[in-house]
Amino acid sequence: MQEYHIHNLDCPDCAAKLERDLNKLDYVKKAQINFSTSKLFLDTSDFEKVKAFIKQNEPHLSLSFKEAAEKPLSFTPLIATIAVFLGAILILHLEPSPFIEKAVFVVLALVYLISGKDVILGAFRGLRKGQFFDENALMLIATIAAFCVGAYEESVSIMVFYSAGEFLQILAIARSKKSLKALVDVAPNLAYLKKGDTLVSVAPEDLRINDIVVVKVGEKVPVDGVVIKGESLLDERALSGESMPVNVSERSKVLGGSLNLKAVLEIQVEKLYKDSSIAKVVDLVQQATNEKSETEKFITKFSRYYTPSVLFIALMIAVLPPLFSMGSFDEWIYRGLVALMVSCPCALVISVPLGYFGGVGAASRKGILMKGVHVLEVLTQTKSIAFDKTGTLTKGVFKVVDIVPQNGHSKEEVLHYASCSQLLSTHPIALSIQKACEEMLKDDKHQHDIKNYEELSGMGVKAQCHTDLIIAGNEKMLDQFHIAHSPSPENGTIVHVAFNQTYIGYIVISDEIKDDAIECLRDLKAQGIENFCILSGDRKSATESIARTLGCEYHASLLPEEKTSVFKTFKERYKAPAIFVGDGINDAPTLASADVGIGMGKGSELSKQSADIVITNDSLSSLVKVLAIAKKTKSIIWQNILFALGIKAVFIVLGLMGVASLWEAVFGDVGVTLLALANSMRTMRA
């Protein structure tokens, strides 16, 4: 779908209606409007027709590929209108006379037309399209009806203060949009490409792999790369949520979007912009703000019935009592108009999505990226979490602690052939074996002789070196190839090695539990998580040791498909949504099948693609943070829903009793919207 910017979009209800209208068009396959970022995502066969349709139905809106500069909002016309209105009312009450009354009536009529210009035009546009329950149409009906029953001052005051409230609402929405827009504006928009001795300004999207870019102090690294010259400090908080600057020097890996704080750096490009870390952050935040939560979908549906229902109630209040001789029509029409004033669901339509987007924003600033706002809802319902072990609960920094040769082979041979087989693997265990080989053997001739490499998920690898077949993996791997072997010790992770179908020994590898793992599980329990489980492809002894330390159940020696099956059983046992946290390629199926899959940031690309949430800083404490954000977001959203509906219900009752006046009822509409909007902004500070 193509992305467009919508200019002058300041009404959430109008945005929802426009989205529905666009999706009814024959030449539009799909249209989606993101009110919080003022963007239209459109799949159409005729863009010009879409532009013409929008121009005809919403003349004040316009589309463009690029975002226009924001026009400052001026308070002057609003203040002048209010001053004229209050001055006219004051003169009328201080110097009452027939001439003054006529003059003030003319002034009030002009104030009504000036302050209500947008409402009147919007009402006629809506009525022309058959939208009789449009907010503008209802406001026009209410004020004209107030004129008809002799409430001239109140009729004008409604329009003036309603327009003032709408202006403040637009101002508040603009500020909230600016806060949300900041989340997707972390990407650099310029790069300095080095060509010989000159620097050329280019867009990050135009950079190619192996290009050399210069990053000056105070500027952002344009794409992922490696430092080839210079030493500096980088602020990576936009990516990881960590405020502590990171030291970088030659050969240090750097991430696109990092802010250079200290000295000039020369960086060699390793990834295209679309594949770099910052592009993925922007895409995830954009994707999350485009999606609607179940609560938002309910509110959207609810709002379509709410306005007609309140209008019907207002009509009944205005008509029925006089028919039963309970008062005059003028009296009950006035009371009905009070109820009519609270017929707009804007407080809900605006505050609910902004609340969720604020939660997404708060999470992203802490290095927690979500792929949809629905995740926030599910997180508040879960009571169970399952973890992968290696790299998730443990540091994933493996070290070879012992080499045990068998059948007449030496330690050097076992390590050499194991490293040979693992050369093309990026698994942490493989990297530890390669590192040990480099340190012990100082030999890398075998690097050029590897072919027919194959990784068997959850078991190990096999590869051919010259004409020799090397197999390295767990006991399941040996059983698969019918290789006889002797028992291995129960402590640590074991990599068995076979050469040409002959067992030659095993390597013992150790891993450490993460420093914050115990504290994380304790804090998760305090957040209401009751059930914990470790699902690991590692052997039983290594998994059991970690599980005993953390005090949770475990399942070991699992293949990827077995891990998914066991997780499903774990979830069904507690009959509630469950979370899975993992980081490896073999975790991808389970992450995809979980109600909420959480991928650790240093894990494989496949695991991050399968996850609903990506924790960029790789810290387990972020699990506690994201649950707290989800709960606070849900609490604030339901505060808004109950507050808005409660206040509106109160004004309907007060209108029925004849206690509330029309201008007071304006607070029940615009005032409640402003308060709900302000409350929603608290989610950004979650």
UniProtKB/Swiss-Prot annotation:
Its EC number is 7.2.2.12, 7.2.2.21. GO terms for molecular function: ATP binding; ATP hydrolysis activity; metal ion binding; P-type cadmium transporter activity; P-type zinc transporter activity. InterPro entries: ATPase_P-typ_cyto_dom_N (IPR023299), ATPase_P-typ_P_site (IPR018303), ATPase_P-typ_TM_dom_sf (IPR023298), ATPase_P-typ_transduc_dom_A_sf (IPR008250), Cation_Transport_ATPase_IB (IPR051014), HAD-like_sf (IPR036412), HAD_sf (IPR023214), Heavy-metal-associated_CS (IPR017969). SUPFAM superfamilies: Calcium ATPase, transduction domain A, Calcium ATPase, transmembrane domain M, HAD-like, HMA, heavy metal-associated domain. It is a multi-pass membrane protein. GO terms for cellular component: plasma membrane. It catalyses: Zn(2+)(in) + ATP + H2O = Zn(2+)(out) + ADP + phosphate + H(+); Cd(2+)(in) + ATP + H2O = Cd(2+)(out) + ADP + phosphate + H(+). It is found in: Cell membrane. Couples the hydrolysis of ATP with the transport of cadmium, zinc and cobalt out of the cell. This is Cadmium, zinc and cobalt-transporting ATPase.
